[in-house]
Structures are given as structure tokens and as C-alpha cells.
Amino acid sequence: MTMIFPKGFMFGTATAAYQIEGAVAEGGRTPSIWDTFSHTGHTLNGDTGDVADDFYHRWEDDLKLLRDLGVNAYRFSIGIPRVIPTPDGKPNQEGLDFYSRIVDRLLEYGIAPIVTLYHWDLPQYMASGDGREGGWLERETAYRIADYAGIVAKCLGDRVHTYTTLNEPWCSAHLSYGGTEHAPGLGAGPLAFRAAHHLNLAHGLMCEAVRAEAGAKPGLSVTLNLQICRGDADAVHRVDLIGNRVFLDPMLRGRYPDELFSITKGICDWGFVCDGDLDLIHQPIDVLGLNYYSTNLVKMSDRPQFPQSTEASTAPGASDVDWLPTAGPHTEMGWNIDPDALYETLVRLNDNYPGMPLVVTENGMACPDKVEVGTDGVKMVHDNDRIDYLRRHLEAVYRAIEEGTDVRGYFAWSLMDNFEWAFGYSKRFGLTYVDYESQERVKKDSFDWYRRFIADHSAR
């Protein structure tokens, strides 16, 4: 297949602040909920982001990797506790200056800065220790995060190409409050919907704040990790309502699906939705981001729905849905590889929400990467499986574009190996290998492959 992507198509890669920066007690930064979560035994091997990739001290060299890669965009997040370290909401100029330098260097390299405003590192002072109070369970959090977004937008202004309000709010609600996998790990099932609504509200308020401070030039976006399922149509529809349309519909249509209310009425009264909220949430955005890695296989079970269940669940309201093993091959995360589903999802989003440009904001593969040393002493990482994964998913994106879907960009996850949340440092997604002891960087074969792909398949 001869693929030439449209002129202006963004080829990029992505990272997140807590996963790479380290320096958690430097530059005025204070703890986030992930500092607390990782330091209290909730991650593999007790790993934390205390040092991570030490990007805070090595950012200049790491941005040179982007220049070498030949990308025209870089998606990164602002560490909220580095910018707003105290409950009084006063900005920390040292933190703002750090991100301002990054933006300026990217522009110097001809790389568009794509800024994620919230990538899970909620300041600990906004939440109680166990997560049962504060955080995204409280309406006030949405307003405080919007204030922070305005501070960032005032500082970075229209130097930023696109401001993304939220990264994967499904994780921030369903994994963090419904389940126990992510900070704060509350495990209270239906409270995921309360958190989801406040995240939706924050999205709308952040959009308003960014426009007020940065003007109309920068784009506005939100990034969702949709729960893409195959199998029983009724089960697929149920998961779609609970995990996808709970965000998509209020953001893009200004309403929650009536069916969502009906299937959750036994576990959630939705009384936290106030008059005027949906108007605030339903803000015009310029692009919808999609993080895509794999699919699920589901079917309706024979057991009845448990309408009063308040147990830990990442899919509250779907206790009568069975999650089945998926066919291989699988990545190191245990996720199946299904590039056709990326194509199908892009087309479906284009059909269901017409006129909304799309960007694949994350896509990548965890592999069991090993460093080899050649006879000339040069270190290498041969990751052919990752190359095949990236190639097949880029082909899926191109197929969607050729059939009329408006896809504006693709971001490989990730620029370099990093702290993989609850999995600690056990999973490697990077195009660049990181030795966490020495902090040495080694470009993997996939780095060079992606560089060549961008050069060969970009419109001149």
C-alpha cells in the first residue's frame, strides 16, 4: 500500500508528566495523588515516579530525541502539583517557567506543542488520603482545575498548538473511583459516575478558561480511551453507554443518554448533575483525541443484573456482562492486537459525531525489550513486534482517511520507556529504551523505523 498522509497531518509521540519527570520534591512541586498511591503499596514492586526518566533534569537532551525522530508534534502534560503546589491556588513561577522553556524549544525545532492539562496527577491537597472525600467526587475540584488551566493558558498562550483538557477520564473515574487500579483506588463502583460527571464539568470549564486566557488561535481537544468491544451486541451496547457515551454525549451532544440513566437507576441517582451543567460541558472543541491499544470481548451472562451493587467495579451497571479472553497475539500488557478495530472506531466516531476531526493521540505496544551490544560496542534494541504493531495501526488510520474520515494526526506511545502507572517499570512502551539505573537512552529499532515512515509517508 502506497500511503501519503494528507498535508499537515501530525506525526508525533507522547509522554505524561508523572511518568517521566521525576524530581518530585524539586522546583516547588508538592505531592499528587499518584505520589501517595505509589508510596503506599499500590504499584508493582513498590515502584514510584520519584525519579522516573529524570526528564526534569534531562529535558534538553530528550527533546533532541524528538528532533532526531522527525516528528512535527509532541504531546506532553503539565504537572499540576508543579504549577499549583499549594491549596491557595497561587501559581509557582518556577514550574511555569519549566514548561515555557519546553514549549519554546519545541517551537525552535519546528515541533507543535500539544499540551495535556490533566493527565491524572491531581494535587494531593485536593483529595483525602483514602480518596473517600475530595478529589473528583467533589464538584469544587472541577472549578479548581479550571482555574489552574487558565493560569497555564495565560502563561503559554498561543505558543501552544492545541490544549487538551483531559486524558482518558474513563481511567480517572472508572479505574480510580469505581475500581482500585488507579489513584486513589477507592473501589466504590457507582461513584465512578459522580467522578465522571465532575470530570466532564472540568472539561467544559477548562475550555472556557483556556479560551479566555489564550484566545481563539490554539485548538481545544479532549482525549478519550474508548472501551472498544466485540461480541454480543447487547453487551457491547451496555459497555458503550457506561464507558464511552458517559463522556462523548455530554461533551459533544450536550446530554447524557437516557438509557444510561435507566440501566444505572438502581445504583446511581445522578443528583449531582445540576441545572446548567450540560451547557457548561458542551463546549465547542476543535478535535477529538482517541487513545487506542486493544479490544475487549464481551457477552451478556445468564445471571441477573445486581441493581443495588456498590462493590468495586470498573463497569458499574454491567454486572450481568461477562468479559471473555481475547484471541492472541497479545502484548506484554496482555492486550490483544486488533488494528481493524482502530479503523472501525475512527469510522464509527466520524459517523456518530459528524464534523468532528479526530486524532489518534496514543497507540503503542509494550514489548519485552532487551539491550544487545554489537561487536562495535553500539547498543541496540531489536523490537520488530512493535514495528509491526505500529505499521498495521498506521495502515488502519490511512484506510479510514482514504474512506473519508477526517483524521488529523497519529501519536505513538511513547517517546521513551517510563513509569507505567500500577505496573511500575515492568512494561516498556517507548521508542527509546531507558536504563533506569544509569538513565542512559538507547534508540530502539522502532525509533528508526518511525523516523523513516514519517519521512516516506508525509505529503511534501
Curated annotation (Swiss-Prot):
Regulation: Inhibited by Cu(2+), Ag(+) and Hg(+), but not by other cations such as Mg(2+), Ca(2+), Mn(2+) and Co(2+). Inhibited by 1-amino-1-deoxy-D-glucose and p-chloromercuribenzoic acid, but not by EDTA or dithiothreitol. Inhibited by the disaccharides sucrose, lactose and cellobiose. The monosaccharides D-fructose, D-mannose, D-xylose and D-glucose increase the beta-D-fucosidase activity, but not the beta-D-glucosidase activity. D-glucose inhibits the beta-D-glucosidase activity, but promotes the beta-D-fucosidase activity.
A single MF term (Gene Ontology): beta-glucosidase activity
Temperature sensitivity of activity: Optimum temperature is 45 degrees Celsius with pNP-beta-D-glucoside as a substrate. Retains 60% of its activity after 10 minutes incubation at 50 degrees Celsius.
PROSITE patterns tied to this protein: GLYCOSYL_HYDROL_F1_1, GLYCOSYL_HYDROL_F1_2
EC number: 3.2.1.21, 3.2.1.38
Entries under Pfam families matching the protein: Glyco_hydro_1
Keyword Secreted attached: yes
InterPro entries found in the cross-reference section: Glyco_hydro_1, Glyco_hydro_1_AS, Glyco_hydro_1_beta-glucosidase, Glyco_hydro_1_N_CS, Glycoside_hydrolase_SF
A GO cellular component annotation in the UniProt record: cytosol
Active site annotation, chain numbering: E168, E362
SUPFAM superfamilies for the chain: (Trans)glycosidases
GO biological process: cellulose catabolic process
Disulfide bonds: none
Catalysed transformations (reactions): Hydrolysis of terminal, non-reducing beta-D-glucosyl residues with release of beta-D-glucose; Hydrolysis of terminal non-reducing beta-D-fucose residues in beta-D-fucosides
Protein localization: Secreted
Activity profile over pH: Optimum pH is 5.5 with pNP-beta-D-glucoside as a substrate. Retains more than 90% of its activity between pH 5.0 and 7.0. Retains 70% of its activity at pH 4.5 and 8.5.
Subunit structure: Monomer.
Family per similarity comment: Belongs to the glycosyl hydrolase 1 family.
Function: Bifunctional beta-D-glucosidase/beta-D-fucosidase. Activity towards pNP-beta-D-fucoside is about 80-85% of the activity towards pNP-beta-D-glucoside. Also has slight activity (less than 10%) towards pNP-beta-D-galactoside, and very low activity (less than 1%) towards pNP-beta-D-xyloside. Hydrolyzes laminaribiose, sophorose, cellobiose and gentobiose. Not active against maltose, pNP-alpha-D-glucoside or pNP-beta-L-fucoside.
Protein's recorded name: Bifunctional beta-D-glucosidase/beta-D-fucosidase
Organism: Bifidobacterium breve
